[in-house]
């Protein structure tokens, strides 16, 4: 009886790879339940969702909306004027300082990341900066040195993998960080692009195309489908496409980009039918790839799909009972809110708390 009592009193340990919404929420929940928690993050707490994706992109969209509101203020009877040297009123133009905009966006993202880190520290979570990978079914090895030669090893009762995903890169359209860009590289631009070509009309492509159009850039959106936002409600997508065209955006439907090349100070996108579209910059928004390669998942017995996503059930558990996964690296819906719920659910389930399994039909999403 004494031995049994002691086994129940032993503090459970949880190791988490990835500090995005899923890993962050898993760490907080595990700490609140009294577990010994270690979180490994290579880029900063909050992951890409906070640092390069959701927070900066939605802040950019809000900035673009503000620019439109100012431009259309006269329609509401609000008029902005400046006086010339002669005393006559001059109607000012809306000017976008993209360098200042991007500096603010990244500052907001970093502030939120720092706040999240502070909350984890306050909760007693041990944080390790580095690249983590599984070492067997209960271990995590972290490369902490700049050259990947220094290592730290963690043993834990429960492992949570929340490594996220990265922008998909096509062989014939390799991003260079200057003219051919992924959505994580947009915030390095110092000036508004003269003509932004967006390849991919899913949620990411449509949101950025709309934002840069509202900021004043010429935008061409290349969609391989019949209309923008494939997979969403067709009537709603049709309305959004009309709004895009009314705002001056060029939408090329049923057009597939074969390659993207630099051309002097611009880019040329070659379509599958031989047409060429020239612009100043190109944003590649053709999906994402889970960051699951080379981190020891298959060696630990974790089942992956052909696309590299981690197969999880409705409580975020993988094919290995004590290994869980959350976020964009899993087969569930790639939303920050879902990742957060998966992270909490994973540790609740692992540590014996009550959970209500996720239901896809009850997941709501929003497009900005």
Protein language model annotation of sequence segments:
Residues 177-192, 276, 281-357:
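FAD-site-proximal beta/loop scaffold in flavoenzymes
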Residues 54, 161-218, 222, 298-300, ...:
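Glycine-rich dinucleotide-binding loop and its adjacent helix/turn
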Residues 15-17, 132, 153-164, 198-199, ...:
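Short hydrophobic core segments
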Residues 6-20, 192-202:
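Beta1/beta-strand and adjacent pyrophosphate-binding region of the FAD-binding site
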Residues 2-12, 28-35, 40-192, 225-229, ...:
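Glycine-rich flavin
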Residues 131-133, 202, 256:
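Conserved acidic residues
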Residues 13-38, 206-213:
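N-terminal Rossmann-like FAD-binding beta1-loop-alpha1 element of flavoenzymes
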Residues 18-23, 164, 200-205, 287, ...:
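Conserved phosphate-binding and hydrolysis motifs of nucleotide-dependent enzymes
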